[in-house]
Regions:
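C-terminal, well-structured catalytic/ligand-binding subdomain of enzymes
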Residues: 21-22, 27-71, 75-76, 80-109, ...
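Positively charged n-region of N-terminal signal peptides that target proteins for export
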Residues: 1-4
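Bacterial N-terminal signal peptides
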Residues: 7-16
Length: 173
């Protein structure tokens, strides 16, 4: 039995997993009283880097694929304390629009450049051109203590406020 278990475990370790996992912990569940976020990024791009950008309103740092020069990041934080990350989802699309998809990195790049708080993000989304070209869960925390996930597709979102969760956290994969 031990050999079978070891063999199965070895197979699982060698299989590729392409699902990001993230979690947000609200300030009510952290010793500092400030929210925290974590993302495990599964990607086919093995070369990544952290880059600094002078944004439209805010300067920011972001995680990006090394071959990219500008225009998209896969998580980041700006000088106002606004942080964003995403996990891809493949079951949120409700339309059959013929549009470019996989634009999550572009959306996060522009959000970091323009938003300081969760409220700013929601207001900014009303001006961001649709279709958004996304199918993902975006995790956001801010310096004001905001902590939320946004389940988004091309034209709408559902907000999950982590500060109202009884356990004080939310895990998304």
């Amino acid at each position: 039995m031990k050999r079978i278990t070891l063999f199965l475990f070895a197979i699982v370790l060698t299989c590729g997993a392409w699902a990001c996992t993230s979690f947000i912990i609200s300030g009510k569940a952290t010793p500092s009283g400030k929210p925290a976020m974590f993302k495990h990024r599964d990607t086919g791009e093995l070369n990544n880097r952290i880059a600094y950008f002078e944004g439209k309103k805010y300067a920011f740092i972001g995680l990006m694929n090394s071959p990219m020069l500008d225009g998209e990041v896969w998580s980041g934080m700006n000088e106002a304390g606004f942080c964003i990350m995403n996990t891809a989802s493949y079951n949120l699309r409700e339309d059959t629009l013929d549009c470019q998809m996989d634009r999550e990195g572009e959306l996060m790049y522009h959000a970091l450049s323009n938003c300081a708080t969760i409220a700013d993000f929601e207001a900014w989304l009303t001006t961001y051109p649709q279709p958004w070209g996304v199918e993902a869960n975006f995790g956001i925390i801010d310096a004001q203590g905001g902590a939320a996930y946004y389940e988004m597709n091309n034209s709408r979102y559902i907000k999950y406020d982590v500060n109202t969760m009884p356990e004080g956290y939310r895990v998304v994969t």
